Amino acid sequence: MSPKVQALLLLVGLITFLAVHAEEELSETVESERSCAKEYQWCDWNTRPCCDNISCICSWIGTNCECKKGIIRTIKDWYKGK
C-alpha cells in the first residue's frame, strides 16, 4: 500500500475512535446533569436537588426555586480558589 493510503486509513481509524469515545463521555455527562442542578439553575427538593450540597432556595410562596450557595460557602470556595 502506498503511504498516502496508509495515512488515510490511520486518519479514518483515529477519527472513528475519537467519535466513539466522545459519544460515551457525552452520555455520561448528560446522565449526571439530569440528576442534580448546578449553582444558579432551577431546582426542586423532590425531583431535582442541587449538586455539591448547595441549598435549594425558593421564593416565599415556594416557587422560583434556584440553587444558591450561602455566604460562608462562597467565602470558603473563594479562599480555596474554586
Curated annotation (Swiss-Prot):
Tissue specificity: Expressed by the venom gland.
Family according to the record: Belongs to the neurotoxin 02 (plectoxin) family. 04 (U16-lycotoxin) subfamily.
SUPFAM superfamilies in the record: omega toxin-like (SSF57059)
A GO CC annotation given for this chain: extracellular region
Protein name: U16-lycotoxin-Ls1a
The UniProt record lists the keyword Zinc-finger: no
Cellular localization per UniProt: Secreted
Signal peptide start-end: 1-22
One matching Pfam family: Toxin_9
Recorded domain comment: The presence of a 'disulfide through disulfide knot' structurally defines this protein as a knottin.
Chain residues in the propeptide: 23-34
Keywords, alphabetical: Disulfide bond, Knottin, Secreted, Signal, Toxin
GO MF annotation terms: ion channel inhibitor activity; toxin activity
Highest taxon in the source lineage: Eukaryota
Residue ranges the record marks as coiled coil: none
Disulfide feature: C36-C51, C43-C56, C50-C67, C58-C65
InterPro entries in UniProt: Spidertoxin
